[in-house]
């Protein structure tokens, strides 16, 4: 939480009056890490809502670093396709199993999507032959007590048969919900029923909506990271200007103190001989060409402290400030140095607070397409004048050299002949147009008959 407020006293963000105009509050927080993505948020307003899931700190920081590196090293913008391999899915504090990445990718590309999360369960067989289902991680925002009540209701209504007992054995070490089954019950079938009828499997609806210049906007993942980086550029720029101003003010005073040390006896004489501090300040300004700030700093010091100043200590501080001022001016003058500061600070945050991912990413049957089940191979499609279609592999054909006899590719019905012949692959789609104006789409995976059929 302190990293959200880091440097808030250095004019890094704007302040506005609070509700009763008695105090001032920040419009936004400096936030050294993308809090909106890392911790997530949920909110409902008039006509709109936002529901952003939490993410892994290391992954989000790595994504921002990727954007910075592309700008600094290659002078180009980052694409969403470069971010998706880094931030693959949300990371819920309660763990759970995220089913596939299709919903995550849709949410990250469009700003809206549905992510299916399943409880982490395992089936144990007891010595008496009975089985029990043990849930050790629940989907995000699922109330454990309500879940147990729901399962009990389903058992009572006989919508799920085979459960004999439900126990909550959770403790400080973690969640543990035990579901005991009858000896003749099929544990996998009951587990699938629980996934279907209870929140052991739940859906997280993503709406990545936030205010940009006081206007609500649904953003994809890259947009959110880019806007955060712009915010950090503004924060670090304002902080650097603040630090530069303070360093120059302090160095200006040090220069006055060093000049006073060169004439310390005369300075003390002027101060002691003056009727008040104002007269002493004016005399010092006139005699040593000091500024109002420098003279005031000398007058404000007690004589004992003034005579006890160590020149070497002041000179070392002066040299340090000169180097610091040069560094701060360089950061303000060079965008790449500014981005380097942001990268260094964010990397330190990830190193200090980052942890391993809690939510695992599993496979979802919806992520498996027909292309994944069909081997890719070159193929030839032949269609006859009577509408017969045949698929043949390219291996069935070979070039006919001069002379010799060819190979018969297919058998046709009397008075039928090949009208169209095309070469494609089994991962391409074939459109079938009917005389009724309809079109049907199918993968080119027509069953492959023998060569002479």
Predicted region positions:
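P-loop NTPase nucleotide-binding/switch module
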Residues: 4-32
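Short glycine-rich loop/turn motifs
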Residues: 30-34, 377-380
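Short glycine/proline-enriched loop/turn "hinge" motifs that connect secondary-structure elements
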Residues: 35-37, 169
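Intrinsically disordered, low-complexity linker/assembly segments
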Residues: 30, 38-39, 208
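C-terminal interaction appendages of subunits in large macromolecular complexes
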Residues: 3, 8-11, 42, 48-447, ...
């Amino acid at each position: 939480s302190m990293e959200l407020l880091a440097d808030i006293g250095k004019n890094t963000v704007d302040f506005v009056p609070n509700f009763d105009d008695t105090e001032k509050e920040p419009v936004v927080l400096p936030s050294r890490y993308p809090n909106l993505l890392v911790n997530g948020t949920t909110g409902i307003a008039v006509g709109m809502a936002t529901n952003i899931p939490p993410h892994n700190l290391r992954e989000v920081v790595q994504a921002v670093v990727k954007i910075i590196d592309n700008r600094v090293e290659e002078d180009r913008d980052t694409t969403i396709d470069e971010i998706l391999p880094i931030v693959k899915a949300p990371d819920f504090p309660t763990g759970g199993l995220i089913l596939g990445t299709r919903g995550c990718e849709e949410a990250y590309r469009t700003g809206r999507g549905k992510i299916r999360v399943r409880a982490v369960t395992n089936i144990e067989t007891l010595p008496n032959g009975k089985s029990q289902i043990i849930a050790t991680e629940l989907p995000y925002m699922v109330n454990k007590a309500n879940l147990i009540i729901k399962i009990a209701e389903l058992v009572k209504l006989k919508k799920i048969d085979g459960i004999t007992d439900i126990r909550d054995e959770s403790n400080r070490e973690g969640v543990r919900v035990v579901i005991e089954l009858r000896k003749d019950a099929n544990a996998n079938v009951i587990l699938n029923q629980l996934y279907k009828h209870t929140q052991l499997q739940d859906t997280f609806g993503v709406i990545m909506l936030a205010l940009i210049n006081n206007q609500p906007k649904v953003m994809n993942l890259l947009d959110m990271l880019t806007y955060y980086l712009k915010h950090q550029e503004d924060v670090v720029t304002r902080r650097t200007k603040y630090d530069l101003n303070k360093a120059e003010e302090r160095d200006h005073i040090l220069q006055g103190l060093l000049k006073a040390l060169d004439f310390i006896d005369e300075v003390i004489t002027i101060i002691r001989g003056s009727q008040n501090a104002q007269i002493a300040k004016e005399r010092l300004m006139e005699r040593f060409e000091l500024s109002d700030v420098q003279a005031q700093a000398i007058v404000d010091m007690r004589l004992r402290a003034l005579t006890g100043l160590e020149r070497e200590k002041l000179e070392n501080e002066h040299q340090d400030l000169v180097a610091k001022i040069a560094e701060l001016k360089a950061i303000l003058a060079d965008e790449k140095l500014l981005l380097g500061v942001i990268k260094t600070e964010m990397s330190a945050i990830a190193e200090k607070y980052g942890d391993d991912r809690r939510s695992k990413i599993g496979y979802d049957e919806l992520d498996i397409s027909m292309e994944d089940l069909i081997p890719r191979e070159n193929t030839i499609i032949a269609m006859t004048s009577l509408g017969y279609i045949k698929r043949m592999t390219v291996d069935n054909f070979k070039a006919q050299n001069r002379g010799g006899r060819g190979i018969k590719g297919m058998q046709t019905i009397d008075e039928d002949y090949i009208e169209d012949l095309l070469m494609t692959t089994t991962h391409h789609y074939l459109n079938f147009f009917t005389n009724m104006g309809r079109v049907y789409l199918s993968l080119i995976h027509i069953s492959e008959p023998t060569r002479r059929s």
